[in-house]
Curated annotation (Swiss-Prot):
Protein name: Probable long-chain-fatty-acid--AMP ligase FadD30
Cystine pairings recorded for this chain: none
Keyword line: ATP-binding, Fatty acid metabolism, Ligase, Lipid metabolism, Nucleotide-binding
Gene Ontology MF: a single term: ligase activity
CDD domains xref list: FAAL
Major enzyme class: ligase
Organism expressing this protein natively: Mycobacterium bovis (strain ATCC BAA-935 / AF2122/97)
Gene name of this polypeptide: fadD30
A GO BP annotation: fatty acid biosynthetic process
Pathway terms, separated by semicolons: Lipid metabolism; fatty acid biosynthesis
InterPro entries, per database record: AMP-bd_C, AMP-bd_C_sf, AMP-dep_synth/lig_dom, ANL_N_sf, FAAL/FAAC
Documented EC number(s): 6.2.1.-
Pfam families: AMP-binding (PF00501), AMP-dom_DIP2-like (PF23024)
Length: 585
């Protein structure tokens, strides 16, 4: 069934069941809750659809509706309403006066949006953003909360059943060149099926599905859209949404919502697990229990084994089951999901000899190993999405334990980027494997840009190809370096290289607090921190640090999904725009 036919079925068979709930914290009048049943949601969706259908059709292309609105139920109605009208929705961030506003404006321009859907609250900012960053000032901007309820059903169900039915998911990387991944409804339904098969333990032949979903992830992000919209829609359970800002202001809210709802499914990036551990008090959790939690995905950025260990230890007194926490791997080019740990099993990790990893092959650490790297263990089988390790230069499939690029094959994989050069899309999305193993299709394969290796039915991720740091001919993975630095600084870290006359130099930038208090440092500590970090990187990694910066909290540039952007850090460093809290001799 398509997304919209599933929604209409829910509105018909369970019209009064709660569908979407939005928790709006910290408003001027206190916390507020906005609720919609399935029938109410369908009415809102058809109101949006009726308005868009009134614009008519383009003869040669599908109309696009960019959505740039605050997190909430209007965002949900806007996305589904565009699909319902046979349009292509384009989920984007709400303009908030930050660097990401440029990305939003450029995306509106790139997708040639016929309209921009927003709310009355954000309308002025949206108009200013699209005018400033090159989109036509005549592009209609529609406040979703002002649309009248329609009479009759205004959904174009025929368009939902064709491969033409699609949306654009802009990746969270480059601000200067946002890329819209073209995703069909077939891609989505395949990925939902893959998620159900791989995340939920099967009992008696049926998956143990969640009874609710809890999400604070932004709906414009690939994981936020899957967890906050597609999963509850296809599973048929209520979703409790809140905003990323509400989580950041009080991370304990995430755990409290999980405790208060039945068998919940949820997801967040690795940094959120660290925040939940650091910022959730005993008072916050008083009287609460997490023993009923179905699944918590850790994804969207490199999963750190230490984070998983600390998270499980912190919430063990509240009966959180280790098997409920699921380290995961995915990307927007494949909707979102690619792999996770084995269903029903707790997350595990393995220690490898770091020197062998630097030389391009994996060897287990032993008592003689001088330096070990611990990596999360993911499960790999012969079901889609298929995963293989390939030499990125020769396109030859690599054997067990050899480090190469991770390639993906499956019906959830996009056909390419919108408005991209044909050669780029062929190289990225239609790659062919040479000397493929038995049972391995020759093509098409998605080049992920990630490095990893396979051992048996397990695979491991070591980092991004573009972030690889090479010093004295040896490969070093920034995640490994950053983990070492965090042991001394406590905050977020970026390890990146800069080139000077063809020579690569390692730079470390670490966020620290300067006030007194737990996990904070004083000015007198800075030189000590630098000495310890430089010494550790030399002894443990064999690395020479050219420059070491301590910067204020929040100073390191991030992508729209909250990940540290090493490329942006390097660019700001080169322009001398990274703010330092201390200068070292």
């Amino acid at each position: 069934m398509s997304v919209i036919s599933t929604l209409r079925d829910r509105a018909t068979t369970t019209p009064s069941d709660e569908a979407f709930v939005f928790m709006d914290y910290d408003t001027k009048t206190g916390d507020q809750i906005d609720r919609m049943t399935w029938s109410q949601l369908y009415s809102r969706v058809t109101a949006v659809s009726a308005y868009l259908i009134s614009y008519g059709r383009h003869a040669d292309r599908r109309r696009t509706a960019a959505i740039s609105a605050p997190q909430g139920l209007d965002y949900v109605a806007g996305f589904l309403g565009a699909l319902c009208a046979g349009w292509a929705p384009v989920p984007l961030p709400e303009p908030l006066g930050s660097l990401r506003d440029k990305r939003t404006g450029l995306a509106v321009l790139d997708c040639a949006a016929d309209v921009v859907l927003t709310t009355s609250q954000a309308e002025t900012r949206v108009r200013a953003t699209i005018a400033t960053h090159g989109a036509s000032v005549t592009t209609p901007v529609i406040a979703l909360d002002t649309l009248d309820e329609p009479s009759g059903d205004n959904c174009d169900l025929d368009s939902q059943l064709s491969d033409w039915s699609s949306y654009l998911q802009y990746t969270s990387g480059s601000t200067a060149n946002p890329r819209g991944v073209v995703l069909s409804m077939r891609n989505v339904t395949e990925n939902v099926d893959q998620i159900i098969r791989n995340y939920f333990r099967h009992e008696g032949g049926a998956p143990r599905l969640p009874s609710s979903v809890v999400s604070w992830l932004p709906l414009y992000h690939d994981m936020g859209l899957m967890v906050g919209l597609f999963i509850p829609l296809f599973v048929g359970c209520p979703v409790i949404l809140t905003s990323p800002e509400a989580f950041i202001r009080k991370p304990a809210r995430w755990m409290q919502l999980l405790a208060k709802h039945q068998a919940p499914f949820s997801a967040a990036p690795n940094f959120a697990f660290d925040l939940a551990v650091a910022k959730t008090s005993e008072e916050d959790m008083a009287g609460l229990d997490l023993g009923h939690v179905n699944t918590i995905i850790n994804g969207a950025e490199q999963v750190q084994p230490n984070t998983i260990t600390k998270f499980l230890r912190r919430f063990r007194p509240y009966n959180l089951m280790p098997a409920a926490v699921k380290p995961s791997y995915g990307m927007a080019e494949a909707v979102v999901y690619l792999a996770t740990t084995k269903a029903g099993s707790p997350p595990t990790s393995t220690e490898f000899d770091a020197d062998s990893l630097a030389r391009g092959h994996a060897e287990l650490s032993t008592f003689e190993t001088e330096r070990a790297t611990r990596l999360i263990r993911y499960h790999s089988d012969d079901k889609e999405p298929l995963l293989r390790i390939v030499d990125p230069d020769s396109n030859i499939e690599l054997g067990p334990g050899r480090i190469g690029e991770i390639w993906i094959h499956g019906k959830n994989v996009s056909t390419g980027y919108h408005n991209a050069d044909d050669a780029l899309n062929r190289d990225k999305f239609q790659a062919s494997i040479r000397e493929a193993s038995a049972g391995t299709p020759r093509s098409p394969w998605l080049r992920t840009g990630d490095l990893g290796f396979i051992v048996g039915d397990e695979f491991y991720i070591v980092g991004r190809m573009k972030d690889l740091i090479i010093q004295d001919g040896v490969n070093h993975y920034p995640d490994d370096i950053e983990t070492t630095v965090k042991e001394f600084t406590g905050g977020r870290v970026a390890a990146f290289s800069v080139s000077d006359d063809g020579v690569e130099h390692l730079v470390i930038a670490a966020e620290v607090r300067t006030e007194h208090g737990p996990d904070k440092v004083t000015i007198m500590d800075f030189s000590t921190i630098k000495r310890l970090v430089v010494s550790a990187l030399s002894k443990l990694h064999g690395l020479h640090v050219t420059d070491f910066l301590l910067v204020p909290p929040g100073a390191l540039p991030k992508t729209t999904s909250g990940k540290i952007s090493r490329a942006a850090c390097a660019k700001q460093y080169g322009a001398n725009k990274l703010q330092r809290v201390a200068t070292f001799p």
